[in-house]
Swiss-Prot record:
Signal peptide: none
Keywords for this protein: Cytokinin biosynthesis, Sporulation, Transferase
Record has Signal as a keyword: no
Pfam assignment, any one: IPT
Function text: Transfers dimethylallyl groups to AMP as part of the biosynthesis of cytokinin phytohormones like isopentenyl adenine or discadenine which controle spore formation and viability.
Catalytic activity line of the entry: dimethylallyl diphosphate + AMP = N(6)-(dimethylallyl)adenosine 5'-phosphate + diphosphate
Protein name: Adenylate dimethylallyltransferase
Catalytic class of the enzyme: transferase
This enzyme's EC code(s): 2.5.1.27
Organism: Dictyostelium discoideum
Highest taxon of source: Eukaryota
GO molecular function: AMP dimethylallyltransferase activity
Family: Belongs to the isopentenyl transferase family.
Length: 283
């Protein structure tokens, strides 16, 4: 069974490309993203809605709750989950479904820095072999990186404060998770100890993309539904703009760290693996 690995930093089009290959070869996409294993963090992690699969099959390594302990799960747990998924795909694999001899039985899409490092540094020890790697990478020109950051800014803006009324948001997503921690005792008092634990789980999982700033925003008792009745509109616009800028910078810096790591890992790929670099210009 041939496996195609599509890698790249945030916002470069990995999901669109993996869906295209999935439909072309009738092959499932296995998502190598640790945070997308938490459905409660679907907006924060960029986990697409099922309506965006466009007929392709998308498999996550596992489904986990945002709760104490799950932030410390070792990388080997996810790798073992991946191997189990591949065993199942292999058992169901029918070569006659492939359009040609170069068809892939599975598409990997990644993803998380920790999982990519674990996968690519131990690539020869895996029971299944990756036959081709496509690396989608923003070109290094200053102008292109300005456009890349602007694209992330646009994505973050919609993630935090969607313009379409009724759409879910990262603000509401994080608020739902934090509310799980606000358990009430018999005296009607909030158990702040568990609340703080949930908060620390969030920070541990997605602290690199500015989640503490979102939490701080909510700690000020921000309420998306009635904020206009509490705060001056100009002040509201100011604090929203500040949050968008902060989260954009966090996502952009994380993307740069992804690029740096992948650049390093690519140099270590075995020569037997077909490799394609897609330098993209952001538009």
């Amino acid at each position: 069974m041939k496996i195609l690995l599509i890698i790249g930093s945030t916002g470069v089009g990995k999901t669109d490309l993996s869906i295209n290959y999935s439909k072309k070869y009738n092959a499932p996409v296995v998502v190598l993203d640790r945070i997308q294993c938490f459905p409660e963090l679907s907006i924060t992690s960029g986990r697409p809605d099922e309506s965006e699969y466009f007929g392709s099959k998308r498999i996550y390594l596992t489904d986990l709750l945002v709760e104490p302990g799950n932030e410390n799960i070792k990388k080997t747990f996810y790798v073992n989950k991946l191997i189990n998924i591949l065993n199942e795909i292999k058992n169901n694999y029918d070569t006659q479904n492939l359009p040609n001899e170069k068809g892939y039985g599975c598409i990997f899409e990644g993803g998380s820095i920790s999982l990519l490092k674990e996968l690519l540094t131990k690539i020869n020890k895996l029971p299944y072999k990756i036959t081709c790697v496509i690396y989608i990478r923003p070109s290094d020109s200053i102008d292109n990186h300005k456009l890349y950051k602007a694209k992330i800014f646009k994505r973050v803006s919609q993630m935090l404060f969607p313009t379409e009324e009724g759409n879910d948001s990262q603000i509401l997503e994080v608020k739902r998770i934090l509310n799980k921690g606000k358990t009430v005792n018999a005296q009607g008092e909030i158990n702040l100890e568990y609340y703080e634990k949930i908060k620390q789980v969030l920070i541990s999982l997605v602290g690199l993309v500015g989640i503490e700033d979102v939490i701080h925003f909510l700690d000020k008792q921000y309420d998306q539904k009635n904020i206009t009745s509490k705060l001056d509109p100009n002040y509201l616009n100011e604090i929203q703009s500040q949050l968008i800028e902060t989260i954009t910078l966090a996502h952009y810096n994380y993307a740069l760290s992804q690029i740096e790591l992948i650049d390093s890992l690519i140099k270590q790929l075995p020569k037997s693996i077909e490799y394609c670099l897609k330098n993209i210009e952001i538009n």
